[in-house]
Regions:
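Gly/Ser-rich catalytic serine loop of serine hydrolases
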Residues: 62-63, 88
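ATP/NTP phosphate-donor binding region
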Residues: 1-60, 67, 71-76
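Helix N-cap/beta->alpha junction signal
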Residues: 61-62, 132
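Catalytic core of DAGKc-family lipid kinases
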Residues: 5-8, 35-38, 75-192
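Short active-site-adjacent helix-start/loop capping segments
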Residues: 66-69, 91-93
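Short, intrinsically disordered, charge-balanced linker/junction segments flanking boundaries
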Residues: 196-199
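Short, contiguous clusters of charged residues that form electrostatic/catalytic patches at enzyme active sites
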Residues: 42, 64-67, 113, 159
Length: 199
């Protein structure tokens, strides 16, 4: 019987993460699962120090949950097996690595090392799928704001049109590829991908 700390995001999958946790329990009946709501964790360093010896971690959420975990724990992640149980609405990362829906959690340690990074306003971020810079990033940000208000379904086409016509202003960007720095002014769109899925 193995011990697993299941870090779950209750907002993942448009709020369906609780159902996915029940699926996980039935998939791993012979193991000991300890569930922790990621939204309640304020100090990952202290949280990891309190983990039972020999325990592994399962991240239960979507692409955003995984991305947030990786950035919040960049320099303090424990030396243990880290698994991923996709329970988001898109699960692009899971598709990229061939994880099947309803299958047991997949070991992801090899995928989360040496991730690409982006620096925005002086703050560095790692990403596991891709990032949207420009109107794409603007639309995602506005969509997240609307989703947070709970005003129904988010219409990204309307957000993009309003952004292009009235709100979004192109900005400058410095992009470094293979050690070579490139500077661009009035950038409208600069997506950067590590994964295969965009959208």
């Amino acid at each position: 019987m193995d011990n697993f700390i299941v870090l779950y995001n209750p907002l993942a999958g448009n709020g369906t993460a609780q159902d996915k946790m029940r699926e996980l329990e039935s998939l791993m009946q012979g193991d000991r699962l300890y569930f922790s709501n990621m939204l309640d964790i304020r100090d990952y360093g202290a949280f990891f120090n309190d983990m039972p010896d020999g325990a592994s971690i399962i991240i239960c959420g979507g692409d955003g949950t995984l991305n947030r975990f990786l950035n919040d724990t960049e320099d303090i992640r424990p030396d243990c097996d880290i698994y991923y149980y996709p329970s988001g609405s898109g699960n692009d990362f899971a598709r990229d690595i061939g994880a099947e829906r309803g299958a047991p959690p997949v070991l992801i340690n090899r995928y989360i090392e040496r991730l690409p990074k982006i620096c925005v306003n002086g703050k560095e971020h790692r990403f596991i799928n891709g990032i949207g810079y420009g109107i794409d990033g603007y639309c995602c940000e506005k969509g997240d704001e609307l989703r947070g208000k709970g005003d129904g379904e988010v219409n990204y086409t309307a957000i993009a049109i309003k952004g292009l016509l009235f709100h979004y202003k192109p900005t400058g960007a410095t992009i470094t590829v293979d050690g070579v720095e490139h500077r661009f002014e009035k950038v409208w769109l600069a997506p950067t991908m590590i994964g295969r899925c965009y959208g």
